[in-house]
């Protein structure tokens, strides 16, 4: 019997050949435009390719033809989540669960939606319900571990991830997520090997050939390349001097973002190249964030002392451009939001890290201070008469400006790592679930002696924290 177009579409979709699957399902729909299953399956293939508007069109059409289908509603909810429509997704999944209280996928998807909505304990309950109904699986335990990690219920999170790995030891998502929970606990020696599993998740290594495993380099050439964010680059270059100490004859090449090149020129005996350029010949390569593993970094061996300096001439030039120093007033650098990460749920992390400007504003009111914006982009109109916005070219400029300030107050972004690396007092406005290298609790950082961490008491609730910061700021001595 010959294969039907619908069967061919399903086979191709199962093989992750989604473009071809879409063509097959479209063939079905040319024959019967009312085929809700073909619409549903084509929508799913469109979603796999992140063709979200087309997926939405297909799912809505399928739902109109079969309004009682829980599977259509579940997938539509997942799509709405990807579009950032969390309330709509939640309501749709609750509708499914009201009709089918034992719908496992609805419980799992609701848990993910509630996690993005910052309702971490509620998300945990959803994932526990899914596990109770369907039993343990790597995916369900990973979901549970993620919600527990966000809730900072870290011992429980570690247990969930470890249970998942007992079922599927090669699951990179479980291994990497376990490393994050361990990092939050300061269990670095256990975390670093698992952190290497990031390359089996959505992250893709820039280079794969000849990875350095920590062996003696002699006079060989090692390419170290930046990965992930600018803050990660600024944080991890601290380990290059120790690498040089252990391999004094090796030639070290650092491929980093353009914004870091001028600042990193101060690193002795390091050849710098732009990250996007073809690297010079090398014998081995290593992603920058694998250095802690190769150097066996623990809390006991981690130094919190400054390791970068601002260029004196550049600092002097910027000092002349900043608001003139006045007795009794502080110069304070501020960052209230990070740059856009994308659209829909892709921007969730940025939104969660950032303080809405209306909630940040009380920090600027009635304060004997001159505020300097350290974030890129045009200054909002509401800040024009409150904040000085220098035209910053790169991190050499930012470092020079920071060196002329009394304090930096910033959300979790690259600026806090730069301020800490310079030894400048920096107050970090930290979201409730924290971040891997900021520990789960405490006001100090093992990475930066000059850092004070202000932590949200409840997810998404910035006003009480901003009020506390403002109160403390007013009490600081002014010379």
Regions found by a protein language model. Name each.
Residues 1-407, 412-479:
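Alpha-helical solenoid repeat scaffolds of the TPR/TPR-like class and their adjacent stem/linker regions
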């Amino acid at each position: 019997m010959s294969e039907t177009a619908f069967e061919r579409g399903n086979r191709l979709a199962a093989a992750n050949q989604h473009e071809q699957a879409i063509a097959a399902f479209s063939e079905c729909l040319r024959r019967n435009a009312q085929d809700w299953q073909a619409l549903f399956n084509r929508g799913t293939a469109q979603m796999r390719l992140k063709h979200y508007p087309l997926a939405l069109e297909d799912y809505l059409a399928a739902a109109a033809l079969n309004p009682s289908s829980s599977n259509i509603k579940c997938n539509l909810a997942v799509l709405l989540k990807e579009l950032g429509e969390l309330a709509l997704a939640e309501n749709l999944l609750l509708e499914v669960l009201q009709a089918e209280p034992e719908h496992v996928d609805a419980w799992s998807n609701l848990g993910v939606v509630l996690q993005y909505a910052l309702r971490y304990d509620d998300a945990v309950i959803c994932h526990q319900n899914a596990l109770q109904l369907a039993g343990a699986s790597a995916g369900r335990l990973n979901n549970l571990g993620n919600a527990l990690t966000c809730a900072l219920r870290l011992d429980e999170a570690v247990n969930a991830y470890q249970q998942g790995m007992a079922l599927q030891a090669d699951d990179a998502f479980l291994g990497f997520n376990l490393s994050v929970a361990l990092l939050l606990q300061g269990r670095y020696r256990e975390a670093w090997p698992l952190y290497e599993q990031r390359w089996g998740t959505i992250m893709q290594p820039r280079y794969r050939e000849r990875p350095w495993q920590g062996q003696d380099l002699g006079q060989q050439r090692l390419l170290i390349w930046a990965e992930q964010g600018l803050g990660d680059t600024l944080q991890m270059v601290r380990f290059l001097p120790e690498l040089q100490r252990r391999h004094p004859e090796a030639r070290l090449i650092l491929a980093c973002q353009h914004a870091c090149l001028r600042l990193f020129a101060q690193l002795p005996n390091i050849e710098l190249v732009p990250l996007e350029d073809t690297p010079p010949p090398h014998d081995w390569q290593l992603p920058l964030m694998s250095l802690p593993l190769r150097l066996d970094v623990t809390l006991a061996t981690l130094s919190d002392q400054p390791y970068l300096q601002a260029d004196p001439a550049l600092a002097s030039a910027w000092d002349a451009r900043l608001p003139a120093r006045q007795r009794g007033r502080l110069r304070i650098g501020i960052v209230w939001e990070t740059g856009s990460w994308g659209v829909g749920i892709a921007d969730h992390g940025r939104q969660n890290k950032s303080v809405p400007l209306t909630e940040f504003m009380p920090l600027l009111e009635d304060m004997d201070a001159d505020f300097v914006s350290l974030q890129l982009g045009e200054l909002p109109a509401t800040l024009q008469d409150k904040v000085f916005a220098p035209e910053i070219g790169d991190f050499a400029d930012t470092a020079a400006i920071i060196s002329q300030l009394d304090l930096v107050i910033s959300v979790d972004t690259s600026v806090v790592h730069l301020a800490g690396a310079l030894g400048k007092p920096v107050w970090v406005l930290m979201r409730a679930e924290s971040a891997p290298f900021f520990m789960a609790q405490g006001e100090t950082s093992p990475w930066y002696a000059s850092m004070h961490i202000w932590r949200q008491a409840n997810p998404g609730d910035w006003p009480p924290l901003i009020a506390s910061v403002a109160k403390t700021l007013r009490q600081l001595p002014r010379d």
